[in-house]
Curated annotation (Swiss-Prot):
GO terms for MF: omega-3 fatty acid desaturase activity; oxidoreductase activity, acting on paired donors, with oxidation of a pair of donors resulting in the reduction of molecular oxygen to two molecules of water
Source lineage: Eukaryota, Viridiplantae, Streptophyta, Embryophyta, Tracheophyta
Organism of origin: Glycine max (Soybean)
Protein name according to UniProt: Omega-3 fatty acid desaturase, endoplasmic reticulum
Subcellular location: Endoplasmic reticulum membrane
Presence of keyword Ligase: no
Transmembrane segments: 55-75, 212-232, 236-256
Family: Belongs to the fatty acid desaturase type 1 family.
Keyword terms, alphabetized: Endoplasmic reticulum, Fatty acid biosynthesis, Fatty acid metabolism, Lipid biosynthesis, Lipid metabolism, Membrane, Oxidoreductase, Transmembrane, Transmembrane helix
């Protein structure tokens, strides 16, 4: 039933192990550099946050969104709607990334400005700002840790085998996993409990309950506004202007976040216990190239340096990554260059969903394993 994907043995030779007369790189080997060395390689100006520059990106995105809405309402034909929905959904995703930067504090040095802008941006696309910010902080603090990570965490073999066959098939068959984000906000992932909307959820410490309540209220206000607009205009108009673009945004979010932490062709280790460290966990992330979309969604594809140093503003991430690559060496996985649109990544998503099903219940360094029965059912 199970095809085991075994990791290479640990290497003491800067991440390499000898096999015959050649050396193979072992991505799970402790790196020969410290995080301070990576930090020192990044130019000082890359750490500087410019709130006016950050706000200019907000203005850019809001103006594009407003122009798209105005054009769609003015021309109102089905051909334009077919163009409008994916473009507007992509712009919703761009807003999410800017709100994400507010949550990290990379938007500005002002907590008040970060919170204000973050609430406006995230509430407008039905994301509870503080609830998501805090769970995402947990994700960054524990990236690559099987038991403590928060985003797209591998299922252990025990949890996987307790899923019924239909749940397994849906979870690992594209496009179904690309629609799970709203479910995650309400109930988290299999094996975890809690809601991003509940101030008393075990996701949050008591000191942050007030912020969670405020964000949930903002979310509810936006949701109520959409219902009100449906009554005074028409449900179909709100569906076309907002509903379908919202689901395009959700697909972008799940697509991007999954691929930054998975890649069957790249053999990414996951850790437990004493083998995990902040640096080793961060090095399991993957950069991706999105072609023309790269700038639209604010350089989120430069994910390795972002995960190690989330306080770096997005507009400095490309330069910071280039500066750090000589230190990272083979621990940095060079992304495949994209055509104008990143259709090549769909192949990687499908391959990973077909191969990366669960990890062992034991072991401090583990890799994804494949359920051969599920693999065959996906191909049938």
């Amino acid at each position: 039933m199970v095809k085991d994907t075994k990791p290479l043995a640990y290497a003491a030779n800067n991440g390499y192990q000898q096999k015959g007369s050649s050396f193979d790189f072992d991505p799970s080997a402790p790196p020969p550099f410290k995080i301070a060395e990576i930090r020192a390689s990044i130019p000082k100006h890359c750490w500087v946050k410019n709130p006016w520059r950050s706000l200019s990106y907000v203005l850019r995105d809001v103006l594009v969104i407003a122009a798209l809405v105005a054009a769609a309402i003015h021309f109102d034909n089905w051909l334009l709607w077919l163009i409008y929905c994916p473009i507007q959904g992509t712009m919703f995703w761009a807003l999410f990334v800017l709100g994400h930067d507010c949550g990290h504090g990379s938007f500005s040095d002002s907590p008040l400005l970060n919170s204000l802008v973050g609430h406006i941006l995230h509430s407008s696309i039905l994301v509870p700002y503080h609830g998501w910010r805090i769970s995402h902080r947990t994700h960054h603090q524990n990236h690559g840790h099987i038991e403590k990570d928060e985003s797209w965490v591998p299922l252990t073999e025990k949890i996987y085998k307790n899923l019924d066959s239909m749940t397994r098939l849906i979870r690992f068959t594209v496009p179904f996993p690309l629609f799970v984000y709203p479910i995650y906000l309400f109930s988290r992932s299999p094996g975890k409990e809690g809601s991003h909307f509940n101030p008393y959820s075990n996701l949050f410490p008591p000191s942050e309950r007030k912020g969670i309540a405020i964000s949930t209220l903002c979310w509810a206000t936006m949701f109520s506004l959409l219902i009100y607009l449906s009554f005074i205009t028409s449900p179909l108009l709100v569906l076309k202007l907002y509903g379908i673009p919202y689901w395009i945004f959700v697909m972008w979010l799940d697509f991007v976040t999954y691929l930054h932490h998975h890649g069957h062709h790249q053999k990414l280790p996951w850790y437990r216990g004493k083998e995990w460290s902040y640096l080793r966990g961060g090095l399991t992330t993957v950069d991706r190239d999105y072609g023309w979309i790269y700038n639209i969604h604010h350089d989120i594809g430069t994910h390795v340096i972002h995960h190690l140093f989330p306080q770096i503003p997005h507009y400095h991430l490309v330069e910071a990554t280039q500066a750090a690559k000589p230190v990272l060496g083979d621990y940095y996985r060079e992304p495949e260059r994209s055509a104008p649109l990143p259709f090549h990544l769909i192949k990687y998503l499908i391959q990973s969903m077909r191969q990366d099903h669960f990890v062992s219940d034991t072991g401090d360094v583990v890799y994804y394993q494949t359920d051969s029965l599920l693999l065959h059912s996906q191909r049938d």
